């Protein structure tokens, strides 16, 4: 296994890192110019940059004034660790730590995902997979990989900096989001899924923490560490994917022969969570309890309803009391306050049989989105929906991006390292 990891590490060094570093010119939409931001947002950034920071061995600003360290330099290049400064830690995960940083090349805020490598293990496979996939994905609703820095001690991915994630956004706006904002978020989520599914890529880890939200309301898919290309010669996949609450019943019952329907179920759960203000199927203990939550709503599957379900390893209908399918609006009360097409889309995304679930491309054409401006349906992949005149987020009951709101309740720290 160690030899295999070392071989993968060497291959990764040859994969795009050799004499080539991603520049902003290659990334399509940046052109070296920051997107316009509200004047108060710029002020907020400046104030945060002025905060005194203590010295740290891992802090590149330790021992020097900010004015000395933070300056644009013409000689700096992409792929160089000295081209970026850490500002603050955003989160920590299983194999990586994410920092908010700034580029000394052009002054752009960035997110630095630092993966510390153990000599005997080399680069984690999840990092190799994430980098290889993201280098080929250029879409407005997928987090942008700017640069890759590879040293003996660490591997750093330099991403565009996005202000928060959907989990934190929902925490700041309890009780469900504005119905129009949900429509915009769902359109962007499905747009991103349609893009990767069209390239035979499954995300496999959809959850609110992995959906980044900018101050404009741009939603971006992040954390492709579990993503996998279906073009890789492999007939089955691991069943240990997707956080339990967003895992579809076929995977919970042990299926390893899944497709894009896996991501659609997760997106459907997120849809309900944005509407309701709480998770759709909040299991606590284990797979059994998670299945019980699902069967209570959509019923226990049978061969008549779902041909082949009895062949799944964890299909144990005798463990559950017979349950009949319920109307979604009876389970999630907010649906009863909205047009039927909202419930219809949710039902098509949360179908029991994965073969019956709607595709991301078809979901974008669902009547639920008919009230959005028609030009949204014809945008280039790299163009944000907020480039269309009149498309903007509505104010939530508690608007985290308004100046007055920020003075009362600071944005909660990121709970997940993506």
From Swiss-Prot:
Catalytic residues identified in the record: 205
Cofactors: Mg(2+)
Limits of the Protein kinase domain: 84-369
GO MF terms held by the record: ATP binding; cyclin binding; cyclin-dependent protein serine/threonine kinase activity; metal ion binding; protein serine kinase activity
Cytoplasm found in the keyword field: no
Record's signal peptide: none
Catalytic activity: L-seryl-[protein] + ATP = O-phospho-L-seryl-[protein] + ADP + H(+); L-threonyl-[protein] + ATP = O-phospho-L-threonyl-[protein] + ADP + H(+)
GO biological process, one term: regulation of cell cycle phase transition
Annotated Pfam families: Pkinase
Enzyme Commission number(s) of this protein: 2.7.11.22
Keywords from the named record: ATP-binding, Kinase, Magnesium, Metal-binding, Nucleotide-binding, Serine/threonine-protein kinase, Transferase
EC top class, as a word: transferase
Binding site for ATP: 90-98, 113
GO cellular component, one term: cytoplasm
Family, as annotated: Belongs to the protein kinase superfamily. CMGC Ser/Thr protein kinase family. CDC2/CDKX subfamily.
PANTHER family in the cross-refs: CELL DIVISION PROTEIN KINASE, CYCLIN-DEPENDENT KINASE 15
Role: Serine/threonine-protein kinase involved in the control of the eukaryotic cell cycle, whose activity is controlled by an associated cyclin.
This protein's name: Cyclin-dependent kinase 15
Higher taxonomy: Eukaryota, Metazoa, Chordata, Craniata, Vertebrata
